Every structure is written in structure tokens, then in C-alpha cells.
A protein has these predicted regions:
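Helical membrane-embedded segments and adjacent short helical loop/helix-boundary regions
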Residues: 2-16, 20-82, 87-98, 102
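Transmembrane alpha-helical segments of multi-pass membrane transport proteins and ion-pumping complexes
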Residues: 12-25, 42, 46, 50, ...
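Generic secondary-structure signature for well-ordered alpha-helical cores
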Residues: 27-31, 53, 146, 170-175, ...
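Membrane-interfacial segments
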Residues: 30-34, 55-56, 60, 86-87, ...
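Hydrophobic core positions of alpha-helical segments in small-molecule transporters
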Residues: 40, 98, 154, 210-211
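Short, electropositive, low-hydrophobicity segments enriched in small/polar residues
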Residues: 57, 106, 122, 163, ...
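Internal active-site segments that recognize and position negatively charged phosphoryl groups
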Residues: 81-160
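Alpha-helical membrane segments and immediately flanking helix-loop junctions
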Residues: 123-150, 156-158, 172, 176-214
Length: 230
């Protein structure tokens, strides 16, 4: 069995897909935010690796093929935006202000947290790209001297939390405007948040897709500036 895992180029991909399918089944059955498919799949994969003492390198021989699809999948998010382009043109100033303020708030929150908890410089820059998609965040972290593997974990946690609590936050804050919901999810919770935005509606999904791209670009620029503040 272990020899098959070590020599298989598809074991990692297979176990990842099965784990995600389990997450989807649980979400449909219980309809609760805690049963997020991505969160469930992460727990399942980690559990399998620990129980059967499978080395991460062996798992990643197949798992990396799913990672390769991350960038093209992000690019495909332009499709819903194109379908709602008329809304973007009509609300351009509000959209730009929303994404800019959301990105700035995210960077400021990390700076405040770093000072509050006494992070060193490497820990600080590792956290800076927390709200942007993994494909961009890994590059930002590496460029600034952060720990890329931890950056990836932080990005995933941020996205999952955003996905889980978005509807609760919107309900408490009485936010009902679809454009605002989409921008909030895309700016703060990247692609994972966008998955939730698409569940909420086509306008939310389109605005969230736009927010991912613009917030990513702003964070690349802003992170370089904020990195020098600690």
C-alpha cells in the first residue's frame, strides 16, 4: 500500500478530490456554515496523512496537479464579471472606493496585530498577504522574505472564515446591497469568499471576482509599503 502511494502520481489528487466530495455531501446534508467543503477536505487530508504516516512529499506528488489549476481557475472568475459589466460601469466610483478601503483595512489590521502581539519582521510580512488569492499571496510573501508555507495556511484560514461568517456578518450589519456583499467577500476572503458570493447571487459573484483581481494588485503594491513599517 505504502509503495503504491509513494510511486503513484495520482494518489494526492485522488485523496484531495474524495475529501472535497465528502465536504460537499456534509454541507448539503447539514446546511451549516461549519461544514465548509474546503475546511472538511483539509481536515480529512491531514487526518489521512497522520493516521497512515504518509509523508507530505509523497502526497504532494499528486496533490500539486490540483495546485497547478489554481491560477487558471482564478482567471476564469472574469466570466461572471463580464456578464455583469453594466453594473460595474454604473457603480465604478463606489466599487473602486470599496475595494481600496477594504484592502487598506486588511493591511492596517495586520500591522496593528503585529505590534499588539510582538511579531518579528518575518512573521509580519508572512501575514500581510492574508486576504489575497494564494497564487498572488505566495509570490508576495516570498518577495518580502516571509514563510510561504505559513502564508498559504493563513490565506486558506482567512478565506474559510470569511466564507463561513459572511452571511452572519451581513445580517448583523444589515447589509443587503448585492454589490457591497460581493466586494466585501472578494476583498477580504479572495477566491474562497467568492465561492460564497456566487452562492448568494450572480451580482455578488461578479463583484467578488473583480475584487479579487483589484485587491490583489493593490496588496502587491501596498504590502511593499507596509513591509517597511516594522
Amino acid at each position: 500500500m505504502m509503495e503504491f502511494i509513494k510511486n503513484s502520481a495520482f494518489f494526492g489528487a485522488m485523496i484531495s478530490l474524495i475529501a472535497y466530495e465528502i465536504g460537499l455531501i456534509l454541507k448539503k446534508k447539514f446546511k451549516m456554515a461549519i461544514f465548509n467543503p474546503l475546511l472538511i477536505s483539509i481536515i480529512c487530508v491531514i487526518g489521512v496523512l497522520l493516521i497512515f504516516h504518509i509523508d507530505y512529499g509523497d502526497y504532494n506528488e499528486g496533490g500539486k496537479y490540483i495546485s497547478y489549476l489554481l491560477t487558471p481557475a482564478t482567471v476564469c472568475l472574469a466570466v461572471p464579471l463580464y456578464e455583469q459589466i453594466h453594473l460595474l460601469k454604473k457603480n465604478l466610483k463606489a466599487v473602486a472606493a470599496g475595494i481600496f478601503s477594504g484592502t487598506l483595512a486588511g493591511l492596517c489590521s495586520i500591522l496593528l496585530m503585529a505590534k499588539l502581539f510582538g511579531f518579528d519582521h518575518q512573521e509580519y510580512v508572512t501575514m500581510l498577504p492574508k486576504s489575497i488569492t494564494t497564487a498572488i499571496g505566495m509570490g508576495v510573501s516570498e518577495e518580502l522574505g516571509g514563510i510561504v508555507t505559513i502564508t498559504v495556511a493563513v490565506i486558506i484560514i482567512t478565506g474559510v472564515l470569511g466564507n463561513m461568517i459572511a452571511e452572519v456578518v451581513y445580517k448583523i450589519a444589515k447589509i443587503e446591497e448585492p454589490i457591497a456583499k460581493g466586494l466585501g467577500l472578494g476583498t477580504s476572503a479572495h477566491a474562497i469568499g467568492t465561492a460564497k458570493a456566487m452562492e448568494l447571487g450572480p451580482v455578488e459573484g461578479a463583484m467578488s471576482s473583480l475584487a479579487i483581481a483589484v485587491a490583489g494588485l493593490l496588496t502587491v503594491i501596498g504590502a511593499s509599503v507596509f513591509a517597511g513599517m516594522m
